[in-house]
Amino acid sequence: MNTIPYVVEQTKLGERSYDIYSRLLKDRIIIIGSEINDQVASSVVAQLLFLEAEDAEKDIYLYINSPGGSTTAGFAILDTMNLIKPDVQTLCMGFAASFGALLLLSGAKGKRFALPNSEIMIHQPLGGAQGQATEIEITAKRILKLKHDINKMIAEKTGQPIERVAHDTERDYFMTAEEAKAYGIVDDVVTKK
């Protein structure tokens, strides 16, 4: 059962009721709290564009608790983060894995955070192929290119040598918040706002 809480605010005109996500959006907070798919990506992209239109100078806060998901959906979010003018601060609360971790490390430099008990995981892209041998070969080439591109991105954003990133992402590579800070995925582990 998915229950979305509502909050009530007093205004000059009386009471106003918001679902919690709309209320957080007023404070420029976007939450990714699920697997990243096309629907989640469309919602996050729309929120990023809306907040840029509202005020292109103020930071946007992206809170992440996600096991990852679709690379194409994830890149839609990541490319929009890079496209818009406001800095996007990222915060891992709980778990940022796979593309969730890529979004976390793609926040504005100096503004990437994790809560103390967060866990971060990077790995190579997952995929499958079926059909004729030629189709399988095409898919294999695509996923190998994607693996290289993602490793390069992680290396650039963290300052780690690409050889280390390639080695670490061969399998699921789990990190605590402090280990993610040492790796360069986040800039700080926060305990207070």
From Swiss-Prot:
One of its GO terms (biological process) is protein quality control for misfolded or incompletely synthesized proteins. It holds the Pfam family CLP_protease. The keyword Secreted does not apply. It is found in: Cytoplasm. It catalyses: Hydrolysis of proteins to small peptides in the presence of ATP and magnesium. alpha-casein is the usual test substrate. In the absence of ATP, only oligopeptides shorter than five residues are hydrolyzed (such as succinyl-Leu-Tyr-|-NHMec, and Leu-Tyr-Leu-|-Tyr-Trp, in which cleavage of the -Tyr-|-Leu- and -Tyr-|-Trp bonds also occurs). Belongs to the peptidase S14 family. NCBIfam families: clpP (TIGR00493), PRK00277.1 (NF001368), PRK12553.1 (NF009205). Cleaves peptides in various proteins in a process that requires ATP hydrolysis. Has a chymotrypsin-like activity. Plays a major role in the degradation of misfolded proteins. This is ATP-dependent Clp protease proteolytic subunit 1.
